[in-house]
Amino acid sequence: MTGEDVAARVHAYAWTDRKPGLERTRALLAALGNPEKALKFVHITGSNGKGSTAAMLASVLAAAGYRTGLFTSPHLYRFNERFQVNGAPIPDAALDRLAERVLAAADTLPEHPTEFELMTAIGFLWFAEAGCDLVVVEVGLGGRLDSTNVIPAPEAAVITNIGLEHTAILGSTLAAIAAEKSGILKPGCRAVLYGQSREVGEIVARACVEKNIPLTVTDDSQLTLLSSGLDGQRFTYRGSAPLLLPLLGDYQLRNVMTVLDTVDALRAQGRNISADAVAHGLAAARWPGRLELVHRRPDLIIDGGHNPQCAQALAASLRGLYGEKKLIFLIGVLADKDWQSMVGEVLPLAKAIVTVRPESDRAKDENELAAWVRAQGVPAEAHASIGEALDAALALAGPEDAVCAWGSLYSVGELRHCLGLC
């Protein structure tokens, strides 16, 4: 059975009317022998940047000699990508075997776990079986009631940039969302917060004081950008030697500060992570589908940003890379996102826009999106498939132009597959 076969079986238990809570996950893990109790963790939450932060940190830990698990979501193309050890996705055979075990255990419970709860259990079983020294876990939604929050106190709990997201579940204010995400903070961990609004900072700091948790907040004034281009970004932070980060985008500098402060937190917990390991780990870091340059002449950049904050960060990064040059955009969005604000952020940068419908039942119709773009005064054309849309976008571009495919991780995964990248 392939990873996609397993994904289809697990997806049968997607959220319906089940209430958020940890009881189902705790019961499931108990039925499986509590594999999470054999593991050490770094727990990462936030609205934006948590996946990139997790990937960079996992790369650094692997470079330091630790057998490192990485649990992230969603996947770009293959379900197996969600469960990695030292950068390698779980093999199909192991995924099939562990999924069978998890589903069998789930069937014995009074209330069946949800899709993400099943994935969490599969991940913890795999990381325990693989003998991981540390597991970097990305929260699925929120923090306090996310299924990953059944873990014991992590060595480090990390909160990246927080924005208004999933407001029906997490709350309608930054303070409410920050309180939910602060739910991953447990006595015995060390906390790292990406420096942001006072509203968020006060909530997180208060939670740390209540639980006697040391807190480090990133400091933009301690970062010096030495150079930036399509080959990556060179910088120093808190007096470090110059470091190279191949990931593009201004926002990745914010994320890498969080990574470096987390490394210091882990050192304080007794982990041996040398400066060389940090340099090599960052230089080797990869996070596909996030401002990823996949082709030159013309440049083709793909990005899975999915909300207005991501769109704003993307626009700023593209201006940094291309100045006032107009780009061609290939865009597919989900109808339940604030797509007008998202697309509005890149309209001033657009020479033309090609629209496509992502492979999702929540997708925005490509013809409606193209009509809306044209109404804003930007040329647009719609195509039914990713392959057709990519061909159309590239046909509009000369060798010196740039194409940016963006708007949904669903579209980005399909696009990388079309390009033979996965």
Regions found by a protein language model. Name each.
Residues 1-48, 52-67, 76-77, 190-193, ...:
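N-terminal leader/targeting and accessory segments in enzymes
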Residues 17-18, 22, 26-37, 63-152, ...:
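ATP-dependent carboxylate-amine ligase catalytic core
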Residues 38, 134-137, 145-158, 162-166, ...:
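Nucleotide phosphate-binding/pyrophosphate-handling subdomain across enzymes
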Residues 71, 194-195, 207-229, 246-250, ...:
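Beta-strand->loop->alpha-helix junctions that form or flank phosphate-binding loops
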Residues 110-111, 118, 131-138, 154-239, ...:
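Acidic, Mg2+-coordinating active-site environments of NTP-dependent enzymes
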Residues 131-133, 324, 398-400:
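Short, high-confidence coil segments that cap the C-terminus of an alpha-helix
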Residues 194-216, 231, 299-302, 308, ...:
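C-terminal helical cap/extension that packs against the catalytic core
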Residues 408:
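Active-site-proximal loop/hinge segments that shape catalytic or ion-binding/gating pockets
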